[in-house]
Swiss-Prot record:
This is Stabilizer of axonemal microtubules 3. Residues 128-141 have a biased composition (Polar residues). Residues 240-251 have a biased composition (Pro residues). Residues 81-105, 128-153, 233-260 are annotated as: Disordered. Transmembrane segments: none annotated. InterPro entries: Axonemal_MT_stabilizer (IPR053347). The gene is SAXO3. It comes from Homo sapiens. The lineage of its organism: Eukaryota, Metazoa, Chordata, Craniata, Vertebrata.
Length: 334
């Protein structure tokens, strides 16, 4: 076999040079991902236009940009703003004028200049609009002297009291001779004692009782039921004197703890260890079973016989549908 013949099963790809012997051990990744030599950054075919003279349109323009002395199509607003600034000299950036009144400024514009260009107006909303009814009926009291006055008990005025008005005929409760020498409490024995609408039940019942009212009741420090029993005494429920020390008390007998007897409950009758679902829903019964557990009725008369024969049923055509005989030209019993 000559050296130039190809091995069976090997094909020449588009990337291989014709006439050369292919390598059958190469994979498809080798043919797909070929190694391409890198190209230099500055391609040899690129020609620089920096040294070329400017076009006639650019020469007539009075404003020349610093981007190769040519108007750039790719320059943006941010690119022209974020550049090195010059703070002095003929190429300095223009300065914003200072406002006349620094306290009344909005942004970088003077408020007076802003109002001169556009006057102050209310916003176009229904909040500031007034209807005819709202303009006539404002709800405020009118100063018309012809309006009728209210004739009734007027509130007392201090000027009328000093002129000898009817308020001088009132007797102060501190100078009432009928109640002089008696203990008097406004909230207890006042004139409005029975008509105090805002007096609570606790303030009316649990009040301060004088000694004259408590003379017919036994005192709290007398011998009571708690003195005989070994019950912890609460303050104001027993003798006001502190009890004797614990060391001088007789020893208490040991307490006999009676065990608590739990009530005996009878066992609940059940049908076995079955849950409610298992007891309620039993498995399917045999179709030939006569008596049912939940429905003790016999099978319907249209069901199969106990010894069903071939093609014999208790009801004619009980198990055949209309579609099975439709269009068959067979006589049907009605």
């Amino acid at each position: 076999m000559a050296s130039g013949t190809l091995a069976p099963g090997c094909r020449i790809s588009a990337t291989e040079v014709p006439g050369s012997r292919p390598n059958c051990h190469l994979t498809s990744s080798y043919f797909s991902h070929r190694i391409i030599p890198p190209i230099p950054f500055t391609p040899p075919t690129v020609q620089s236009t920096v040294a070329d003279p400017l076009p006639q349109v650019a020469k007539q323009d009075s404003h020349n940009w610093a981007f190769d002395e040519v108007l750039s199509r790719w320059e943006t607003t941010s690119g022209s703003a974020y550049v090195p600034k010059t703070h002095g000299g003929p190429c300095a950036q223009p300065r914003a004028p200072e406002p006349a009144d620094p306290t009344r400024t909005v942004g970088i514009k003077d408020l007076g200049e802003k109002l001169r260009h556009r006057g102050w107006r209310l916003p176009l909303t229904t909040k500031y609009q007034s209807s005819e009814t709202r303009a006539q009926y404002t709800g405020s009291p009118s100063g018309d002297p012809r309006a009728p006055e209210y004739f009734g008990p007027q509130p007392p005025q201090l000027a009328d009291h000093h002129r000898g008005g009817p308020s001088q005929a009132l007797i102060a409760w501190t100078k009432n001779p009928e109640l002089s020498g008696r203990p008097f409490t406004v909230s207890d024995r006042g004139v409005l004692d029975r008509r105090q609408l805002y007096l609570t039940t606790s303030a009316r019942d649990f009040r301060f009782y004088p000694k004259t009212e408590l003379s017919g009741y036994p005192r709290k420090d007398s011998l009571t039921y708690w003195s005989f029993e070994e019950t912890p005494q609460v303050w104001s429920h027993g003798p006001q004197r502190p009890p004797c020390p614990r060391s001088s008390r007789p020893p208490r007998p040991p307490r006999v703890r009676v065990p608590r007897v739990s009530p005996v409950t009878s066992a609940m009758p059940h049908r076995g260890a079955l849950s409610l679902a298992q007891e309620s829903y039993s498995p399917l019964l045999h179709p030939l079973r006569r008596l049912d557990r939940f429905c003790p009725l016999e099978a319907p008369w249209g069901g199969p016989h106990w010894k069903p024969l071939r093609g014999i049923y208790s009801v004619p055509k009980a198990y055949s549908t209309e579609n099975s005989s439709y269009g068959s030209l067979k006589p049907a019993l009605v």
